[in-house]
């Protein structure tokens, strides 16, 4: 995920190198949660299951092999494709904690799922701040 401009000062100067080290050296260019490979087009079903071209099998959202699922060529109407892009995520959502044990290489899907609680928290704070402004000024704040 892109770093917000007002959060850039929280990251170290060598963030690009640190991020690349986590994504490509430690994780080997694969998502550390589901195992999707960086830079490849991946067939998936939208619920976390994806086709692992190398293994010739379906995998679930945790990277485990899935049994009893037909090959993707027989399920074309249900499959979608996505280009996988790895990003480095902070496990504790604290951008100042750049210890290697706190960083994870995640694909878009896993990153969004990992950040879900943090996004909901920020959304609630934004809602409350806007509602507080509504108490000060007239307007459609309902």
Model feature map: region roles:
Residues 16-27, 96-99:
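Short, flexible, mixed-charge glycine/proline-rich loop motifs
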Residues 101-102, 119-142:
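A detector for short metal-coordination/catalytic motifs
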Residues 1-18, 74-89:
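Short, charged low-complexity linear segments at domain edges
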Residues 27-28, 35:
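Glycine-centered helix-boundary capping/hinge motifs
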Residues 29-30, 106:
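The −1 position to Zn-ligating cysteines in a subset of zinc-ribbon hairpins
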Residues 35-42, 103-126:
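Short Cys/His-centered divalent metal-binding micro-motifs
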Residues 35-105:
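Histidine-centered nuclease catalytic patch
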Residues 48-49, 57-60, 114, 129-136, ...:
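Alpha-helix boundary/capping detector
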């Amino acid at each position: 995920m892109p770093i917000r401009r007002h959060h850039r000062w929280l990251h170290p100067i060598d963030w690009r190198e640190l991020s690349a080290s986590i994504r490509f050296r430690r994780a080997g260019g694969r998502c550390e949660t589901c195992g999707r490979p960086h830079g490849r087009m991946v067939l998936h079903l939208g619920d976390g299951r994806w086709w692992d071209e190398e293994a010739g099998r379906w995998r679930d959202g945790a990277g485990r092999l899935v049994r009893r699922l037909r090959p993707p060529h027989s399920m074309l109407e249900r499959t979608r494709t996505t280009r996988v892009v790895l990003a480095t995520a902070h496990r504790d959502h604290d951008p100042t904690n750049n210890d290697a044990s706190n960083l994870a290489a995640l694909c878009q899907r896993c990153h969004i799922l990992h950040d879900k609680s943090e996004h909901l928290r920020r959304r609630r704070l934004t809602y409350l701040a806007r509602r507080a402004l509504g108490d000060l000024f007239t307007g459609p704040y309902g």
